[in-house]
Amino acid sequence: MGLQGPAKVAIIGTGYVGSSTAFALLFSPLVKEMVLVDVNHAKAEGEAMDLAHAATLIRPVEVYAGRPADCAGSRIVIFTAGANQQPGQTRLDLIHRNTAIVRQALPEILHYCPEALVLMVANPVDILTYVAWKISGLPENRVLGSGTVLDSARFRHLLSRHYRVDPRNIHAYVIGEHGDTEVPVWSLANVAGVDLEEFYLMDGMREEEAFRVEISHQVREAAYEIIERKGVTSYGVALALSRIIECILRNEHSVLTISSVIRDLYGIDGEVALSLPCLVGNEGREKVLAIPLVAREKAALKHSATTLQQLIAQLSL
C-alpha cells in the first residue's frame, strides 16, 4: 500500500482514551475523517458533536458517531474499547473481560474495512494485540499495539530531568510487556550517542546503580501513580497513539516500540506479542530491529515473554 493522502480512521470506544485520542488527531492534517463507535451510541454521539465543534476552530475534519458499517474505508482501526484499569488493579487483571470485548467487536468492524491496519490500545495491550492478530487472520505487520511507546517516553522524560537534557536528544527504549515485567534498556540509553555514564562523568559525577533501580521503578509505576490520583491515564497515551498513526500515514519508517507478534527472537521460544523497537511505516510494522542486549536484559525480556505466553495459554484461541 503506497503513501496516500489524508485518511479516515475509526476509533472503537469513546472513553477517556478514545476521546482524548480523537481530540489529539484533530490537530493532525493526515486525518480527514474520524468515525467514533461505542456500545453506548449516545456517548459516541456526544463526543463526536463536541469534537466536531472544536474542529471548526482548527481545520476541516469530519467527525461523527457511527456503527460498525460506518467504518468502511478506514485506513486504521484504533481499538480502545474495554474495561478501565482501576486503582490497585494490574493491566493483566483485565485479560478475560477485555478479550471477550475484542472477540465480539473486532471481526464485525473488520468485515467492513478488511484492508485496515489494527492499532490495539485496550489493556492488557500485548495480550489483546495477540488476540486481535489471532482472530482477525491479518498478517502480523498489520496488527500493532501501542506497546511501550508511552513507557519509552516516560523513561526519556525521567532521564531528561536527571541529566538536564532535552528529552528529544535522549535515546532510550523500554521493551517487553507494557506492564509489570517491562524492561528499560539501560545498556543502549544515550544522549546524542554518548553513553549515559560517560555523559554523567563529563560533569565530574558518578552514576549510582540505585539511581537506575529507582528510575526503572518510576517508569514501571507511572500509570499506577496517575490512576491513583486522577482515576485514568489519557493524555500521554493519546499523544503516543497520535505519534504512531502519523508515523503510519506519513510513511516515516520511524523506530517505535510498538507491540506486535514475534516468534523465536532473543531466545524466546514460540510466538508472543510484546514491544521491541520496530520500523513503522504505511504497511504497519516493517521490520523488528535486533538490538544488542546485555545478559540481564535478555533474561528480563525472556521472563516478560514467558509471563505473557502463560497468560495467552489460558485463553481459548
UniProtKB/Swiss-Prot annotation:
Gene Ontology biological process: glycolytic process; lactate metabolic process
Please report which protein family the annotation says this sequence is part of.
Belongs to the LDH/MDH superfamily. LDH family.
Q: Pfam families in the record, alphabetically?
A: Ldh_1_C, Ldh_1_N
Activity modulation? Allosterically activated by fructose 1,6-bisphosphate (FBP).
Q: What class of enzyme is it?
A: oxidoreductase
**Residues the entry annotates as binding beta-D-fructose 1,6-bisphosphate:** 156, 171
Question: What's the name of the protein?
Answer: L-lactate dehydrogenase
Give the CC-aspect GO terms.
cytoplasm
Residues engaged in binding substrate: 85, 91, 123-126, 151-154, 233
Q: Which gene is annotated as encoding this protein in its UniProt record?
A: ldh
Q: What is its EC number?
A: 1.1.1.27
Task: Tell me where in or outside the cell this protein is found.
Answer: Cytoplasm
Q: What superkingdom heads the lineage? A: Bacteria
Cysteine pairings via disulfide bonds: none
InterPro entries (alphabetical): L-lactate/malate_DH, L-lactate_DH, L-lactate_DH_AS, Lactate/malate_DH_C, Lactate/malate_DH_N, Lactate_DH/Glyco_Ohase_4_C, NAD(P)-bd_dom_sf
Q: Could you say which residues bind NAD(+) here?
A: 17, 38, 43, 82-83, 121-123, 146
Active-site positions, per UniProt?
178
Protein keywords: Allosteric enzyme, Cytoplasm, NAD, Oxidoreductase, Phosphoprotein
Quaternary state and partners of this protein? Homotetramer.
**Phylogenetic placement of the source organism:** Bacteria, Bacillati, Bacillota, Clostridia, Moorellales
* Functional pathway: Fermentation; pyruvate fermentation to lactate; (S)-lactate from pyruvate: step 1/1
Residue numbers bearing the Phosphotyrosine modification: 224
Organism for this UniProt entry: Moorella thermoacetica (strain ATCC 39073 / JCM 9320)
Query: GO molecular function, one example?
Result: L-lactate dehydrogenase activity
Q: What does this protein do?
A: Catalyzes the conversion of lactate to pyruvate.
**Catalytic activities:** (S)-lactate + NAD(+) = pyruvate + NADH + H(+)
